[in-house]
UniProtKB/Swiss-Prot annotation:
NCBIfam families: 1-(5-phosphoribosyl)-5-[(5-phosphoribosylamino)methylideneamino]imidazole-4-carboxamide isomerase, PRK13585.1. It comes from Desulforudis audaxviator (strain MP104C). The lineage of its organism: Bacteria, Bacillati, Bacillota, Clostridia, Thermoanaerobacterales. Transmembrane segments: none annotated. The active site is at D8 (proton acceptor), D129 (proton donor). Its main location: cytoplasm. GO terms for biological process: L-histidine biosynthetic process; L-tryptophan biosynthetic process. One of its GO terms (molecular function) is 1-(5-phosphoribosyl)-5-[(5-phosphoribosylamino)methylideneamino]imidazole-4-carboxamide isomerase activity. It comes from the Bacteria. This is 1-(5-phosphoribosyl)-5-[(5-phosphoribosylamino)methylideneamino] imidazole-4-carboxamide isomerase.
Length: 262
């Protein structure tokens, strides 16, 4: 399972919000580029960058900082927040962003989603942000009437292959991920799922690892890293240990003996 550190941007700073609320902000750094470099230096293999101002206003507000991050690291960067037209998508992807994450626009503008999926394929990811089983839009400030499972089915029909699933009530709380809902979402379709929201300890990562067979192949960690309840080194060590264990199990499988020749 891939561990992905989060870098959330607001007013050019690196921040974390509690349950996505704009009025409950903690500033962790005034230099998001340095933060991104630190995560890379500590071994991260991908970064998750969110333009919170963009999510709230409906258009990118921190794109300069985003592109500075992309230029400053040598690992893939996925970006979301306020990306609601083809020009936004094209600009980011042509300037080195690896994946673009669509939120509100994926629900409200399906023709736009169709167009960018047709043009860019798996570089388009949809952020499925939920509260009580319903999809949230407009920077999580509104909860749509759309139930999450039919929405996932619609995404599959439109060619989407990967989603970032966030339980809004858990995000930034350090209360642990909503494992039951993540499992329900992952089991419902063949979509690859990046889990996000609530991770606070290594036990949470171990529990998410058990959902890998359902398609949960990555996890975004935000506040836990900034608050120090998990270090990136610990998370990556767990990731490596799981890989090593899988390798050992593979080598210990009994050999198949050749059958009789006909």
């Amino acid at each position: 399972m891939l561990i992905i550190p989060a870098v959330d941007l607001r007013g050019g700073r690196c921040v974390r919000l509690f349950q996505g609320r704009a009025d409950q902000e903690t500033v962790y750094s005034t230099d998001p580029v340095a933060v991104a470099r630190t995560w890379e230096e500590q071994g991260a293999r991908r970064l998750h960058v969110v333009d919170l101002d963009g999510a709230f206003t409906g258009k990118p507000q921190n794109s300069g900082v985003v592109l500075d991050i992309v230029k400053s690291v040598n690992i893939p960067v996925q970006v979301g927040g306020g990306i609601r037209n083809p020009e936004n998508v094209k600009c980011y992807l042509e300037h080195g962003v690896d994946r673009v994450i669509l939120g509100t626009a994926a629900l409200t503008n399906p023709e736009f989603l169709d167009a960018v999926v047709a043009a860019y394929g798996e570089r388009i990811v949809v952020g499925v942000d939920c509260r009580d089983g319903r999809v949230c839009v407009q920077g999580w400030e509104q909860t749509a009437a759309t139930d999450v499972l039919p929405f996932l089915e619609e995404l599959v029909r439109r060619g989407v292959r990967r989603v970032v699933f966030t339980d809004v009530k858990r995000d930034g709380t350090l209360e642990g991920p909503n494992l039951e809902e993540i499992a329900r979402v992952a089991a419902h379709t063949e979509l690859k799922v990046i889990a996000s929201g609530g991770v606070s300890r290594l036990e949470d990562l171990r529990a998410l690892k058990k959902l890998e067979h359902l398609g949960v192949d990555s996890v975004i960690i935000g506040k836990a890293l900034y608050a120090g309840t998990i270090t990136l080194a610990e998370a990556l060590a767990l990731e490596r240990k799981e890989k090593d264990n899988v390798g050992q199990e593979d080598h210990s499988l009994p050999r198949c003996e050749p059958g009789p020749r006909g």
